[in-house]
Curated annotation (Swiss-Prot):
Chief place where the protein resides: membrane
Gene: UGA4
Family in the record: Belongs to the amino acid-polyamine-organocation (APC) superfamily. Amino acid/choline transporter (ACT) (TC 2.A.3.4) family.
Designated name of the protein: GABA-specific permease
Gene Ontology MF terms in the entry: gamma-aminobutyric acid transmembrane transporter activity; gamma-aminobutyric acid:proton symporter activity; putrescine transmembrane transporter activity
Location of the protein in the cell: Vacuole membrane
Keywords carried by this UniProt record: Membrane, Transmembrane, Transmembrane helix, Transport, Vacuole
Gene3D superfamilies assigned: Amino acid/polyamine transporter I (1.20.1740.10)
UniProt key word Transport: yes
Role: Required for high-affinity, high-specificity GABA transport. Also transports putrescine.
Entry's induction text: In the presence of GABA.
Membrane topology: Multi-pass membrane protein
Single Gene Ontology BP annotation: transmembrane transport
PANTHER family: AMINO-ACID PERMEASE BAT1, GABA-SPECIFIC PERMEASE
Length: 571
């Protein structure tokens, strides 16, 4: 090599070093502006995030503000699976069917269909959020991102608390439903000669929570495979019901209920007016069953190609459960004893157990209730996984007590063991309400619904108002015309549901055993969360807290993102 070539190479290397040093000083001088932009519509300064232009999951997660700590083991099918598993159609319908029959067959059939349509609209909007900013924290992160400047921290903190407690209440309601199903199976084997007490139910419930805690502490790859098992288990039991129940009904009961009974028989078993009872009895089965699609969001940091797989998981799980659940209810109403009161007053304590017993006999009823209980267990394991990821993410941002311990991730298995333990302990404590009476148990169902709907609707309202100039769509987006129409319609439905779940099952003669304590517990939790933040937590919680250094950030996002951020800085 000639001397001139060596000199040219030396100069080229020196120029690159000089350029890199200059860029480093330039980036260092940007300070907090290194990764942020300022809203023009009142949302203040937030991270620059553009999912549509990100080239991989790690880059997008870095733009959001976090390093990759959990392993991405969930395929699109398994992301769908965690929501579909938690919805657990037949086990969930079994748990809420008694309340739905309070308005007669037509209320249950059409209430499900109408409510599920609006739930799909809510899910579509959440899918847009998840496609734009896929992070395990989800709801409280989005709230902080779009909320007005000066209110970001307290509102996002309240939403984080609401979502965490609602998911924990969801664990309680699912596991309590499992306890009831196991008790119903035992009662069937003893021909009704078994006393089910609140103490026995809590014992079964607590045992289930402990077993689920152990099961969900395995590596994320095993948890992902569990979702595949749950998909096939739920589909198997549904197909079995579609085949066996009509055959048994025709053989043992001589035929089916006609279309007028299934689609037109309305029977108000409360003292509310017919319209309100239709909403109370008809909407709640679908709202509670198809109510865990945000679990896909909480798996965002374990999902492959999250900006696409999470939206697909949300929308597909809702759509499948909408139609498949509706067909299940039609099948059950075709086969049910026309004397609804005899089903609701079943000595087995479970309306579905009585329907199966009437059509198929004792052995089939025991087998079905055992299979339903198994699927309900898979539901519980899946929602325990989801709530642990929400608890972990919120603790990562110092949102919970003992956050410095809860946010730890095991380096070998990439699993947040302490978050799983915290979620299960919280569920056991909330579950103590079941020892009081049925009204307190019902409050757990209502708390899960109200808390989640508040958490789901809040970031949407802010995205459409104060943060409208910050929203950068991901791969899934309805467009500028349809997106806000769908979003506002979903918000209106969610506000209606929050109000609806606060009402008791009857209008007059309310006693302590018929009172709906959700109207006290829900708002009480939200108010206490705000007070707790003002008095203590504001010293530690400042919204989503990045765990990336500036060097890690610039390396992860690349020069193009840095150039875009710098070009958007105000002079």
């Amino acid at each position: 090599m000639s001397m001139s070539s060596k000199n040219e190479n030396k100069i080229s290397v020196e120029q690159r070093i000089s350029t890199d040093i200059g860029q480093a000083y330039q980036l260092q001088g940007l300070g907090s502006n290194l990764r942020s932009i300022r809203s023009k519509t009142g949302a203040g300064e937030v991270n620059y995030i553009d999912a549509a232009k990100s080239v991989n999951d790690n880059q997008l997660l870095a733009e959001i503000g976090y390093k990759q700590e959990l392993k991405r083991q969930f395929s699109t099918l398994q992301v769908f699976g965690i929501a579909f598993s938690i919805m657990g159609l037949l086990p969930s319908i079994a748990s809420v069917m008694g309340g739905g029959l309070g308005g007669g067959p037509a209320t249950l059939v059409w209430g499900w269909f109408v409510a599920a349509f609006f739930i799909l609209l809510v899910g579509i909007t959440m899918a847009e959020h998840a496609s734009s900013i896929p992070t395990a924290g989800g709801l409280y992160y989005w709230t902080y991102y779009y909320a007005p400047e000066g209110y970001k921290e307290i509102i996002s903190f309240i939403i984080g608390c609401s979502n965490s407690l609602a998911l924990a209440a969801g664990v309680c309601s699912i596991d309590y439903g499992l306890a009831e199903e196991i008790a119903a199976a035992v009662t069937l084997t003893k021909d009704g000669n078994f006393e089910v007490t609140s103490g026995k139910l809590y014992g079964i419930f607590a045992g289930a929570v402990v077993v689920m805690c152990i099961c969900t502490c395995v590596a994320s790859g095993a948890i992902a495979r569990l979702q595949t098992l749950s998909i096939f288990a739920n589909l198997f039991i549904i197909v079995l019901l579609f085949i066996a129940l009509p055959i048994g009904t025709k053989h043992r009961m001589g035929g089916f209920n006609d279309g007028d009974f299934i689609f037109g028989k309305y029977e108000n078993l409360s003292d509310w007016n017919n319209g309100w009872q239709f909403c109370l009895a008809g909407f709640m089965p679908a709202v509670w069953t198809i109510g865990s699609f945000d679990s896909c969001v909480h798996q965002s940091e374990e999902a492959k190609d999250a900006k696409k797989s999470v939206p697909i998981g949300i929308i597909s799980s809702i759509a499948v459960c909408w139609i498949l659940g509706w067909l299940i209810i039609i099948c059950l109403m075709a086969c049910i004893n026309p004397d609804i009161d005899s089903v609701l007053d079943s000595k087995y304590g479970f309306a579905l157990a009585q329907i199966i017993y009437d059509s198929l006999g004792k052995k089939w009823a025991i087998a079905f209730m055992s299979l339903i209980a198994f699927c309900q267990f898979l539901m519980g394991a899946s929602i325990t996984t989801a709530v642990s990821r929400q608890v972990w993410a919120f603790s990562r941002d110092n949102g919970l007590p003992l956050s410095k311990y809860i946010k730890r991730v095991d380096s070998k298995y990439s699993v947040p063991f302490f978050a799983i333990l915290a979620a299960c302990v919280g569920s056991l404590i909330l579950g103590l309400l079941c020892l009081i009476d049925d009204a307190a148990t019902d409050a757990l169902f209502s708390l899960a619904v109200a808390g989640n709907n508040l958490a789901w609707s809040t970031p949407t309202v802010f995205r459409l108002t104060s943060g409208r100039d910050l929203f950068r769509p991901g791969p899934f987006y309805l467009g500028k015309i349809w997106s806000p129409i769908v979003a506002w319609t979903g918000v209106a439905f969610q506000l209606f549901i929050i109000i609806l779940v606060m009402f008791p099952s009857q209008q007059h003669g309310i006693t302590k055993s018929t009172m709906n304590y959700a109207c006290v517990i829900g708002p009480g939790i939200w108010i206490l969360a705000g007070i707790y933040y003002k008095v203590y937590k504001k010293k530690y919680y400042h919204g989503p807290a990045t765990n990336l250094s500036d060097d890690d950030y610039t390396e992860a996002v690349g020069a193009d993102v840095i150039d875009t951020i710098m070009s958007k800085q105000e002079p």
